[in-house]
Amino acid sequence: GRHMTWMTRWQSLTTALVLLCTSLVGCDSDIDSDTLVRELRILSLRIGSTEPFSVADAQAEVKPGPGGLDLVFTSDHLDLNAFVAAPTGPGRRIAAPRPLVYEWFLCVGPASLFNQGTLDPGCRKWLPGDPDPMKSSSLRYLGSGQTFAMPTAALKDVVGGVLQLLLTGGPGGGGTVKLPEAPVSLLLPLILRVRVDGGDPNDIRDREVGVTYLRTWVALPGMTLPAPNVNPSLGDLLAGPDKDGNKTALIPCTAMSCPKNKVKRGADLFLIGGSLPGSAQTYVRADDTEQKMRTETLRYSWFATDGDFDRERTGDTQPDNFWNSETKRPAPAEATSATLWLVGQEERGGADARSYELELTN
């Protein structure tokens, strides 16, 4: 899999509190649910454009070139997209929206390059007292933007170097050549740091770091690249006040507008989330020598600024959920709206996400 992870001091603190409470008799833990979002938070990182079913992998071929073999990518760039929550408004800790800075990095530490799915220790240093990541030898700065068109040329020397070591056992190429029988699959860690422009560098609420893994396929001469993984595409989010009654589709936010969907404050809102047909692909795992076909499993993660969900995650076999704005962490009395986020993901790392503005009515 290629699931996104987060690196924050807050998560470390939460884990410590959980361990402490389990060791004490009668400890009453009041830790917030993972679904509650009241501060800056990365909810999803998507490799691929925001178009439905966009390609989520990088692919390259080794071809004869003027100076020998050359590594040629099938596309000149890959879009990287960040789905970030930063709640503001009446009753919130931050009243007005603040500009955010998005910084993308490639982890090039040896543990990440030669131990697939591992994050090198040098790529884990993001706390206020840690060295500037822009100067880290384990990190390569790629560019900025909530949507960033990453040139695949930025991957060429990294992928080429790893490929040479895997095939020959050394940078000089003097080792025994071990030609694979199928295209080579590499997992490259991509890291996003998002921070408030002009925010407090010592306040962890003003920044967040997320990690995802870019699967890169490389075909040697005579090999055929596999069909690329594509991102799933969320369908309508159906909602209604009755569990078994009629439900209508909530209108999602777009880059141009964020319509308000009226819901009753303090009432259960029953929800059904899912994806469009074709979102769950069939595939062969990269490490499967038996070439067994399997179908992706889609899971849905739910988030909101207030209240609580019945379930933090759902799937296509049990797509139902419900939310109430006033349970556990009620919306502030001054707040006239809440935000709901839905993130869909499959085990190979493809993702899609939507946000919905809810107008709280009495």
Describe the predicted segments one by one.
Residues 186-193, 198-255, 351-362:
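Short beta-strand elements
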Residues 194-196, 342-346:
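Conserved structural position at the C-terminal beta-strand
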Residues 3-17:
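Bacterial N-terminal signal peptides that target proteins for export
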Residues 95-103, 296-301:
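Solvent-exposed loop segments of extracellular immunoglobulin-like
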Residues 22-55, 353-355:
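Bacterial Sec-dependent N-terminal signal peptides
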Residues 182-192, 334-340:
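Exposed beta-strand face motif in extracellular beta-rich ectodomains
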Residues 52-64, 109-162, 293-322:
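Low-complexity "stalk/linker" and mucin-like segments enriched in Ser/Thr/Pro/Ala/Gly
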Residues 58-91, 250-287:
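Contiguous beta-strand segments within globular domains
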